[in-house]
Amino acid sequence: MSTEQELQIGKVVKSHGIRGEVVVELSTDDPDIRFAIGEVLNGKQAGKEHSLTIDAARMHQGRLLVKFAEVPDRTAADSLRGTRFFAAPLEDEDDEDGFYDHELEGLRVIHEGEDIGEVTGVMHGPAGEILEVRLTSGKETLIPFVHAIVPEVDLEEGTATITPPEGLLDL
């Protein structure tokens, strides 16, 4: 299965400790399923692919720490930095009202009928998602991904229409 059909479920941010654990930034709502002990993850990093078996996974200070069977120490864990993990969608991830990050990235941002920029990324926070947008002026801005501000996303047209409150684009 190619990554076009797969979803990114996490990314190695850094190593943790001396026993080969890594900190994983999650991009899945199902970490208990995706990062269960014994699961084999498909990782991609700078053109290289890894198959890694989860030995242990635990939450620590709000972050997921994962120990892979193939990673014996900190040096090996350091080499995984930037590795992105992909997996096929779970049945319940076919939410018609939701969007995957890769579907939003690259969308043209429309305000009052004008193309004002492009979605360059999606940030996930405790209060919800935020679109990272590069305006046509070259300036970067953040737009909360809530229906009141982003009332329409048209994947076929490749656009996200926004109705920002006054001043949001001036920040």
From Swiss-Prot:
Molecular function terms from GO: ribosome binding
Domain PRC barrel: 96-168
Entry keyword set: Chaperone, Cytoplasm, Ribosome biogenesis, rRNA processing
InterPro entries: PRC_barrel-like_sf, PRC_RimM, RimM, RimM_N, RimM_N_sf, Transl_B-barrel_sf
Location (main, coarse): cytoplasm
Compartments in which it is found: Cytoplasm
Spans through the membrane: none
GO cellular component, one term: cytoplasm
GO terms of biological process kind: ribosomal small subunit biogenesis; rRNA processing
Annotated domain remarks: The PRC barrel domain binds ribosomal protein uS19.
Function as written in the Swiss-Prot or TrEMBL entry: An accessory protein needed during the final step in the assembly of 30S ribosomal subunit, possibly for assembly of the head region. Essential for efficient processing of 16S rRNA. May be needed both before and after RbfA during the maturation of 16S rRNA. It has affinity for free ribosomal 30S subunits but not for 70S ribosomes.
Subunit structure: Binds ribosomal protein uS19.
NCBIfam families registered for this protein in UniProt: 16S_RimM
Protein family according to the UniProt entry: Belongs to the RimM family.
Protein name, entry field: Ribosome maturation factor RimM
Species for this entry: Corynebacterium glutamicum (strain ATCC 13032 / DSM 20300 / JCM 1318 / BCRC 11384 / CCUG 27702 / LMG 3730 / NBRC 12168 / NCIMB 10025 / NRRL B-2784 / 534)
